[in-house]
A protein has these predicted regions:
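Acidic, low-complexity cytosolic segments
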Residues: 1-29, 38-156
Length: 156
């Protein structure tokens, strides 16, 4: 299930940003973003891009959605990574936990192979952080639901 609203705890925010910062340094990338599948920007690290990040996040999510349809048409369940290579600028996108998209913007000063390797490692670390976050959010939602239910019964 894709949720459009994110509750990010401070410790998780810093864990995510530390992973993204490490990815930028180890891959010599320009910028890294974490976007949810609805197109909401979760975090952005690195050089500020010369474009509207909100629009970019929406387009990246739509790109992944379109490619998922293409994957199904050719008999795949999904394409977990996408690459867009340009003459000067390139994008590497990777789906993590089937809920968020890691986007790495890099130029010709670094190689796709290096970006792919470092992004894969960062993805594994992000998966661990995100799974813990999802567990917290589910637990939090259950607490809120139980509290609300109890309050409704107490009011009668």
């Amino acid at each position: 299930m894709v949720k459009g609203n994110w509750a990010l705890f401070e410790e998780d925010f810093w864990s995510i940003n530390t992973i993204l910062q490490t990815l930028i340094h180890t891959s010599s990338s320009k910028s890294v973003m974490l976007i949810d599948k609805t197109g909401q920007l979760i975090s952005s690290i690195g050089e500020p891009p010369g474009f509207d990040v909100t629009s970019f996040a929406s387009l990246a999510a739509a790109d992944f959605a379109a490619n998922q349809q293409l994957a199904e048409m050719v008999g795949e369940t999904d394409f977990a990574t996408l690459v867009h290579q340009g003459t000067n600028e390139s994008l590497y996108l990777s789906l993590i936990a089937n809920r968020v998209i890691l986007v790495v913007l890099f130029d010709k000063k670094t190689s796709l192979g290096l970006v792919r390797l470092k992004a894969r490692r960062a993805g594994e670390e992000l998966l661990s952080v995100l799974n813990k976050l999802f567990d917290k959010l589910q637990y939090k939602d259950e607490e809120l639901s139980a509290a609300s239910l109890g309050a409704e019964f107490a009011a009668e």
